[in-house]
């Protein structure tokens, strides 16, 4: 199976007027075998792309749910080599392109070129590096383009319009719009400022826009769709469900299907 690039998957969704669903999981929580099973379930229940978080000891952008998942995964010995070995074996069984979510420190220590080549060879199609500022992204962007990877950059509610334009121009695959200041995690309601930010970005760029941080329910997903998002990115709500010892995989399947149904309902 030939897995499409991230930008190609968004073109496919746009042609069908489909808001993409992008679930997030932490690799290795509770273990890599469960991660494999969960990725297959997400792929079977309506995920268009899937973010796979590389566990890190100091995840500054992540809230308590994903921080705890990263700690558990690291305690079980989850390392990059094992995660890439897993995706090498798995990616051709999935229709959803995989996006690796990784902080910059592990990339820097391995060496940018070495890291990116290993990721590309493992069948991963894109990267999100939440602590990589635009000013330092150019070397990574140049290498990802040569390897067939796409590096997606983040825009926050506090980003100025001028900086939004620069980030939107540089970002590959899609633009990751952070819905709120602060860390990842489930919110009671979506900030109405997201609608304004989406409108502003639409005037700047034709690139797809995914909204993440805080989407915790089918209603939230439908709301960002109605506000004009091209994708709903859902992390903590999936990670929390997968952490349930007895019903984790079943809960992930049910929740993914509920999000897909909400996004497909006019």
From Swiss-Prot:
* Pathway where it operates: Amino-acid biosynthesis; L-tryptophan biosynthesis; L-tryptophan from chorismate: step 5/5
GO cellular component terms, alphabetically, are: cytosol
The positions flagged as active site in the entry are 51 (proton acceptor), 62 (proton acceptor)
Task: Please verify whether the record's keywords include Protein biosynthesis.
Answer: no
The UniProt entry, under InterPro entries, shows:
Aldolase_TIM (IPR013785), RibuloseP-bd_barrel (IPR011060), Trp_synthase_alpha_AS (IPR018204), Trp_synthase_suA (IPR002028)
- The organism sits in which domain of life? Bacteria
What EC number(s) are associated with this protein in UniProt?
A: 4.2.1.20
**What GO terms are given for molecular function?**
tryptophan synthase activity
Note whether Ligase occurs among the keywords. Answer: no
Q: Which SUPFAM superfamilies match?
A: Ribulose-phoshate binding barrel
Assigned keywords, A-Z: Amino-acid biosynthesis, Aromatic amino acid biosynthesis, Lyase, Tryptophan biosynthesis
Q: Name one Pfam family in it.
A: Trp_syntA
Gene3D superfamilies referenced in this protein's UniProt entry, alphabetically: Aldolase class I (3.20.20.70)
> What reaction does this catalyse?
(1S,2R)-1-C-(indol-3-yl)glycerol 3-phosphate + L-serine = D-glyceraldehyde 3-phosphate + L-tryptophan + H2O
State how it assembles. Answer: Tetramer of two alpha and two beta chains.
Query: What HAMAP family does this protein's entry cite?
Result: Trp_synth_alpha
Q: What does this protein do?
A: The alpha subunit is responsible for the aldol cleavage of indoleglycerol phosphate to indole and glyceraldehyde 3-phosphate.
Q: Which family does it belong to?
A: Belongs to the TrpA family.
User: What is the designated name of this protein?
Assistant: Tryptophan synthase alpha chain
Q: Give the gene name.
A: trpA
